[in-house]
Amino acid sequence: MTDIKKIRIEAIHLDQDDPKKCTAKKLERRGLLRCKTRISSAAKRGILLDPLSETLLSPNDLNLIEDGSLVALDCSWKRINESVRIISKTTRLESRILPILLAGNPVSWGKRGRMSTAEALSASLYIVGRKDQAISLLTPFKFGDAFLDLNRQLLEAYSSCNSQTEVEEMQWEFFDRPSSDI
C-alpha cells in the first residue's frame, strides 16, 4: 500500500439483507471495516454515503474523511428511503452521494448507482485519491474486477476533478443529463 494513512471505514448495518450476500459483513470478517448496528456507536465525524443526498462526493472531501471516517449505510435498496430518513436525523456526518457509476455485482450488474456497500466504499476511496485502499477493498469479491473494469474511466475522471461542480459536469460527459436538469 502506498497510501500514507488508511482511511477509517465503517458501515451502519441495518440487517435488512441476506447476511450471506452482505458485502459489509464480508469486509468486516476480513478486518477491512467495522460494522455498527447502533447508529449512536458510529463515527461522529466524516462522510456518510447517502444515495439520496444532493451533494456529490469529490476529491475535496478527502480532508473530511481523513479527519473522521468514511461511513456507508448498509441496508436494503427496497427500504432506502426510510433507512436514510432514520440515519439523517441521528448523525452529524456530512452526507454525500456518489457520482454516476455502474454496479458490477451480480445482483445489480450494469445498473446506475445500484452498488453494493463494498462497491460504494471502494468508489469513494478511489475518487478521493486512495486508489490502493479502494482496490484492496474489492479483492474479497469475485465481482471486484468487473466493477473496476466497468468504471475505471469514470473513476479516473472523477478523481481528477477539483470540485463538486467539476464532478457533476464530468458525469454528464459520460451519461445523458436528466431532462429536468436541462
Where are these regions (language model features)?
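Active-site cofactor/cluster-binding pocket
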Residues: 20-25, 31-116, 120, 127-156
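Long, charged alpha-helical interface segments
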Residues: 152-182
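Short, extreme N-terminal leader segments that mark the start of a protein/domain
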Residues: 1-34
